[in-house]
């Protein structure tokens, strides 16, 4: 810790501190100085660790770019298989978000008459269910028939 400071220098600093601060304030000053030194060491170590981590990440990115530039031809079969599985998983995740060039629904109805009957049946089913929803919403259905009839 004190590489450049010898025993005589430490003794001189202690005596000067005792003379300047006195015996009452010297222990408090020593504690505060040691806490500052510890905080500085912790901060320096955390910065050092962060820099080392960033350098490792940069090295990994550089290694990946080198492997990619080589065409991944030197990889083992198991590693190539896992890369293919990862690519397929990425494609399956991206697939629902891709915009597909499909013909519009009107084009399907023109070329496929079966879909027209399905859509007509669906609209007739929704039309028959509409009066039921009106009677549920509030008024008595018998009063509607008297007013209509």
UniProtKB/Swiss-Prot annotation:
UniProt-annotated location(s): Cell inner membrane
Listed GO MF terms: protein transmembrane transporter activity
Gene3D superfamilies the UniProt entry points to: 1.20.5.3310
Record has Transport as a keyword: yes
A Pfam family hit: TatA_B_E
GO CC list: TAT protein transport complex
Keyword annotations from UniProtKB, A to Z: Cell inner membrane, Cell membrane, Membrane, Protein transport, Translocation, Transmembrane, Transmembrane helix, Transport
Segments traversing the membrane: 1-22
Similarity comment: family membership: Belongs to the TatB family.
Its job: Part of the twin-arginine translocation (Tat) system that transports large folded proteins containing a characteristic twin-arginine motif in their signal peptide across membranes. Together with TatC, TatB is part of a receptor directly interacting with Tat signal peptides. TatB may form an oligomeric binding site that transiently accommodates folded Tat precursor proteins before their translocation.
Known partners and oligomeric status: The Tat system comprises two distinct complexes: a TatABC complex, containing multiple copies of TatA, TatB and TatC subunits, and a separate TatA complex, containing only TatA subunits. Substrates initially bind to the TatABC complex, which probably triggers association of the separate TatA complex to form the active translocon.
Protein name: Sec-independent protein translocase protein TatB
Gene: tatB
């Amino acid at each position: 810790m004190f590489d450049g400071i010898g025993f005589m220098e430490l003794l001189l600093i202690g005596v000067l501190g005792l003379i300047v601060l006195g015996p009452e304030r010297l222990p408090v000053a020593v504690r505060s100085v040691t806490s500052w030194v510890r905080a500085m060491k912790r901060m320096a170590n955390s910065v050092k660790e962060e820099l080392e981590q960033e350098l490792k990440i940069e090295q990994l990115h550089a290694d990946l770019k080198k492997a990619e530039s080589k065409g991944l031809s030197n990889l083992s079969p198991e590693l190539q298989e896992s890369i293919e599985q990862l690519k397929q998983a990425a494609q399956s995740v991206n697939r629902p978000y891709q915009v597909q060039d499909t013909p519009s629904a009107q084009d399907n109805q023109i070329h496929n008459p079966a879909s027209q009957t399905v859509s007509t049946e669906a609209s007739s089913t929704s039309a028959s269910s509409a009066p039921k929803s009106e009677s549920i919403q509030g008024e008595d259905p018998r009063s509607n028939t008297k007013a209509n009839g």
